[in-house]
Curated annotation (Swiss-Prot):
EC number: 7.2.1.1
Gene Ontology terms: cellular component: plasma membrane
Function noted in UniProt: NQR complex catalyzes the reduction of ubiquinone-1 to ubiquinol by two successive reactions, coupled with the transport of Na(+) ions from the cytoplasm to the periplasm. NqrA to NqrE are probably involved in the second step, the conversion of ubisemiquinone to ubiquinol.
Protein name: Na(+)-translocating NADH-quinone reductase subunit D
Cell compartments where the protein resides: Cell inner membrane
Entry similarity comment: Belongs to the NqrDE/RnfAE family.
The UniProt record lists the keyword Transmembrane: yes
Organism: Pseudoalteromonas atlantica (strain T6c / ATCC BAA-1087)
Membrane topology label: Multi-pass membrane protein
Amino acid sequence: MADTKEMKKVLFGPILDNNPIALQILGVCSALAVTTKLETALVMSLALTAVTAFSNLFISMIRSQIPSSVRIIVQMTIIASLVIVVDQILKAYSYEISKQLSVFVGLIITNCIVMGRAEAFAMKSPPFISFLDGIGNGLGYSFVLIVIGTIKELFGFGTILGFEILPLIQNGGWYQGNGLLILPFSSFFLIGGLIWFIRTIKPEQVEPKE
């Protein structure tokens, strides 16, 4: 059983110290696509966190029984099964958001974060700590999506979760929405800015000069 210090490191380390998007540059594609509004960013964050945590748990539980030659196939089968469950739950209880997320929930199957944690951590670690690792990396992914989604919705649409914060000119207010932020590629610049900010407050993450 892992000690409390190790569990805290596994659970909270991926948020800033070892963020899967900002430091490892994994899972960037979905981060670009689903952050136009905070609501879709939150749902995608929850979906990926659940899949990563439970895939880590199940893979770790059977890791000693998986032949090395087929381990990737087994991992993808478990991950795909969990993604199907999550996708069906979204369609049942939040159909409109499911339509907005489109194929990106299904593409969690190929997300580098999920596959990477299964191979690098769950295959070598006990179930409970693997479960925490999945949650931790999900939180790190969620942190980036929530920050980007909040900025884009607030300054692009003047709202947060659909509630008006900055009254738009077309509605009789004073704020002119930034149309550039509504476009998916603007997430590149925002993620770049977030990476710069994190490496400013944590200079140990800056790559040494060659």
